[in-house]
């Protein structure tokens, strides 16, 4: 048997880079978090509260279940950002998900574990198939909430995270904004403008020597 590549040498890997833009969450949970944000808004619009939640079902792919479907105690931020139930519970309750939401003092809020215990994952074989499809590489999740009065939310399906190739037009402005925001945390305004003038202008960037480019990121 001779080894054979899946495709000829090319730019496939770079074209399919996943950018983590929307949430500080493990990638298999990105679309679940986005769906949870939508359901948080839906509950507010329909007079529902998290206290009325009976069960949350996450229809998902096999990798999500294998890697981040976790029950029981979560001992530290690393445990929490690899638990899909935790990452979904936070936006359902608070309408946000930030790095601080993984810290011990925040995780002590009893509402989080109460909602976590009501969240269950079920595998969808089509989601798993599309996850492995090299032309799709979807990371799909679908969320439904069942309430104590017997009513249900609509199912919110998100197939691709914002950082996915199929959402580039939507994602690139957000990625640039994240880049600029993080630069501003380190450099003054003038220095940031110097870096952005080069790095956000492809024609200029391709002519810059690598050592010159890296020197721009030295804080004096």
Model-derived features with residue positions:
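Terminal-appendage/accessory-domain detector
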Residues: 1-220
